[in-house]
Amino acid sequence: MDIAAAREIGAGIAVIALAGVGIGLGNIFSTLVSSIARNPAARPHVFGLGMLGFALTEAVALYALLIAFLILFV
């Protein structure tokens, strides 16, 4: 196995984290929608927490892509 193949395999393994991010984002927003549907008065507080969860979960995706690009191109 040459170095180019090892880099591509390593980058593919690093991007596996994106599957978890997709599941996490779906869970965050489904819970957000159902909690707002149950108690519309709590929308400002719940929406802020949902956006914080979205940002933190999306940061994991950006870190995974960064690591994959570092493996491929550095």
From Swiss-Prot:
It is a multi-pass membrane protein. Keywords: ATP synthesis, Cell inner membrane, Cell membrane, CF(0), Hydrogen ion transport, Ion transport, Lipid-binding, Membrane, Transmembrane, Transmembrane helix, Transport. It is found in: Cell inner membrane. CDD domains: ATP-synt_Fo_c_ATP5G3 (cd18182). The record marks 58 as: Reversibly protonated during proton transport. F-type ATPases have 2 components, F(1) - the catalytic core - and F(0) - the membrane proton channel. F(1) has five subunits: alpha(3), beta(3), gamma(1), delta(1), epsilon(1). F(0) has three main subunits: a(1), b(2) and c(10-14). The alpha and beta chains form an alternating ring which encloses part of the gamma chain. F(1) is attached to F(0) by a central stalk formed by the gamma and epsilon chains, while a peripheral stalk is formed by the delta and b chains. Belongs to the ATPase C chain family. This is ATP synthase subunit c. It comes from Gluconacetobacter diazotrophicus (strain ATCC 49037 / DSM 5601 / CCUG 37298 / CIP 103539 / LMG 7603 / PAl5).
